[in-house]
Amino acid sequence: MMNTKKLLKMAKKWQQRAALRRKRISFHRSTDTTSSSTAAEKGCFVVYTSDRIRFAFPISYLSNSVIQELLKISEEEFGIPTEGPITLPFDSVFLEYLIRLVQRRMDGDTEKALITSISSTRCSLPCSFQLQEHSSTRLVF
């Protein structure tokens, strides 16, 4: 398990890299979509799923081993993003299911089984996709 300082350092590095390129990222929005933002709220980090749904997590989730595994899988699949957001190779339904399991505070054996299951059943995506015209954000607390 990674220590908290290392996790915060990794998250800060990803946020800094995304911030360097944020001005170049163009999100196509319709005129009626004004509430979604490209920047994360204070104390949160943002990830996108393979179906281009935006999730905002509190920074405290970085200490959870399931979330750590999701970020490792994302890094293996897509690398550390330099010109875009962190994308997870899972759809939003699967991520919502994982979030519910994480919120239940699983015991160690269940958590290990879940991590093994995630690692063995992940899907592959083409690395070059663009965000759709609509984007929705889901806050997780």
From Swiss-Prot:
An example Gene Ontology CC term for this record: plasma membrane
Subcellular location: Cell membrane
Domain of life, source organism: Eukaryota
A biological process term (GO) from this entry: auxin-activated signaling pathway
Primary subcellular site in the record, as a coarse category: membrane
InterPro entries registered for this protein in UniProt: SAUR_fam
Membrane topology field: Peripheral membrane protein
Record keywords, A-Z: Auxin signaling pathway, Cell membrane, Developmental protein, Growth regulation, Membrane
Functional description taken from the UniProt entry: May promote auxin-stimulated organ elongation, such as hypocotyls, stamen filaments and petals.
Family: Belongs to the ARG7 family.
Record-given protein name: Auxin-responsive protein SAUR61
Species for this entry: Arabidopsis thaliana (Mouse-ear cress)
Gene name as annotated: SAUR61
